[in-house]
């Protein structure tokens, strides 16, 4: 699936225009690098494409399985590895089902991903993080380890599109 950016603008809360009327498309299999001076809006644009920030105007068409690796990880310090990787709900649903709570909601959340924990642990191991559990706090990891946690997320989620901020 491709990404389409149509007439995207972003205005800071203080009314400063960061960028306006951006238009471009990225086709399946295409690789793109954003290059520009510090503060020109590269990270903001990636956050908008990822759906983590709303544009001031414009339309974005993106795949549902897009995966975003941020530049800075401080906002994840209060989370566990499982929470940062956005697998905690599936993990909880799996444990609930295995404990006898066969509610439809748990099956919907799990979405037949019965090996989510094994895949996640294997991905962490692949990225040199096999010593950490999924419940390990992100704030106890080094910057490089946090980066590798998010890189492991690519192996867990198998996204069609990956956005990497530096």
Regions found by a protein language model. Give the residues of each.
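A short, flexible loop at the N-terminus of ABC-type nucleotide-binding domains that lies
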Residues: 1-5, 9-21, 130
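Hydrophobic anchor residue at the start of the ABC signature
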Residues: 151
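Catalytic Walker B motif of ABC-type/P-loop ATPase nucleotide-binding domains
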Residues: 162-166
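Conserved hydrophobic segment flanking the Walker A/P-loop of ABC-type ATPase nucleotide-binding domains
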Residues: 26-28
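Helix-to-loop junction immediately C-terminal to a conserved catalytic motif
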Residues: 50
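The feature captures the beta-strand-to-loop junction immediately N-terminal to the Walker
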Residues: 35-37
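ABC-family P-loop ATPase nucleotide-binding domains
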Residues: 75-140
């Amino acid at each position: 699936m491709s990404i389409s950016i149509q007439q995207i603008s972003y205005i800071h809360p203080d009314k400063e225009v960061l960028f306006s009327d951006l238009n471009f498309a990225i086709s399946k299999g295409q690789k793109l690098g954003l290059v520009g001076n510090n503060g020109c809006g590269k990270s903001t644009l990636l956050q908008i494409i990822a759906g983590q920030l709303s544009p001031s105007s414009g339309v974005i068409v993106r795949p549902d399985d897009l995966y975003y690796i941020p530049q800075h990880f401080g906002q994840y310090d209060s989370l566990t590895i499982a929470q940062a990787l956005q697998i905690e709900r599936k993990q909880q649903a799996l444990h609930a089902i295995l404990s006898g709570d066969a509610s439809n909601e748990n099956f919907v959340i799990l979405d037949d991903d019965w090996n989510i924990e094994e895949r996640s642990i294997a991905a962490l191991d692949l990225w040199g993080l096999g010593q950490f559990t999924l419940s390990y706090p992100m704030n106890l990891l080094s910057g490089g380890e946090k980066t590798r946690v998010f890189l492991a997320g690519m192996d867990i989620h198998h996204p069609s599109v990956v956005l990497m901020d530096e």
